[in-house]
């Protein structure tokens, strides 16, 4: 899986202070898009290595839906061991068979809260609804936003809003 972008390396020069970053991961979005595109899971360890290299993590949150099964609890434990705070919403199955577990508002609120303490926001999602958030963070806080997403499954509006798009 391609994870590295030929753009900015994120490496600091000796003596420069570490860039303070906030990492926000839309777990459902990245799970389904990597599964559909590559037939496998997103590599959270590799992502963490790349996104945090020579950077200071101010906050790292993974937003997920809780179905209450053991396999998911184990996955959530792994995310916590990597360094993420895991925020959960209950999985709601509607009478018509559709499901609900959307974190868009929660991710947006946290981005606006923590961006003021960061030099960079890193968002992992392909959801075009976040294009407005990315624009707002860049404008209101004057910080760059890196978006990690799966090519072909990441909204063009989100890619265009980002300071840097990193294909997963």
Regions found by a protein language model. Give the residues of each.
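Domain-level signal for Mg2+-assisted phosphodiester chemistry and nucleotide/NA-binding surfaces
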Residues: 2-103, 144, 154
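Nuclease catalytic cores that cleave nucleic-acid phosphodiester bonds
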Residues: 68-168
């Amino acid at each position: 899986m391609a994870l590295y972008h030929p753009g900015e390396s994120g490496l600091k020069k000796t003596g420069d202070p570490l860039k303070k970053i906030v990492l926000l991961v839309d777990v459902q979005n990245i799970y389904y898009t990597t599964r559909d595109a590559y037939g496998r899971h997103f590599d959270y360890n590799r992502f963490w290595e790349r996104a945090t290299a020579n950077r200071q993590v101010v906050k790292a949150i993974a937003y997920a839906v809780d179905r209450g099964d053991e396999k998911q609890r184990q996955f959530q434990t792994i995310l916590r061991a990597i360094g993420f705070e895991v925020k959960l919403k209950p999985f709601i199955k509607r009478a018509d068979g559709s499901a609900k577990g959307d974190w868009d508002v929660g991710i947006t609120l946290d981005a606006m809260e923590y961006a003021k303490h960061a030099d960079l926001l890193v968002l992992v999602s392909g959801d075009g609804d976040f294009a407005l958030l990315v624009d707002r963070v860049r404008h209101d806080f004057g910080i760059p936003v890196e978006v990690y997403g799966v090519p072909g499954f990441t909204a063009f509006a989100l890619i265009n809003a980002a300071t840097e798009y990193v294909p997963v």
